[in-house]
């Protein structure tokens, strides 16, 4: 574990002034695909960088995996998984927030090619639920949410002979 901590850069926790070691890179194929979608969203130049998990204090964007199920399992055990990704936003200006979430959905669903990695590939992104207001905080920040459906093809690498017992 100390090797991992030594090899990562320090990350400042928002609003704390302290730094914590960055977490090790994900090896989950689903998480790698979600991180790729987050990179696509950040490339749009929104009012904030998207984070994973709950929204923090102040204007921001976040995402997290919502309940999803495997859609298809093939004879070779590869799977097609439509992952619902909940996008949440908070901003004092409702128009900026609404425009941002709508732009994310409009742009990502119109791409014709997506990112892939070792053992996974995003094959499509579609709209789940369109952006909608879910509330307004006491500090006058509007809260909105929407869902993207990230369609992932997970392909396992061929097992070697020692794994097959041959």
Predicted regions and their residues:
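Extracellular/virion structural assembly segments
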Residues: 78-80, 90-113
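Acidic-leaning, charged glycine-interspersed low-complexity segments
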Residues: 47, 108-166
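A general secondary-structure boundary signal
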Residues: 34-38, 80, 139-142
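Conserved acidic
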Residues: 29, 96, 140
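Short, solvent-exposed beta-alpha or beta-beta edge segments that form flexible loop/patches at the rim
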Residues: 45-95, 123-125, 129-132, 145
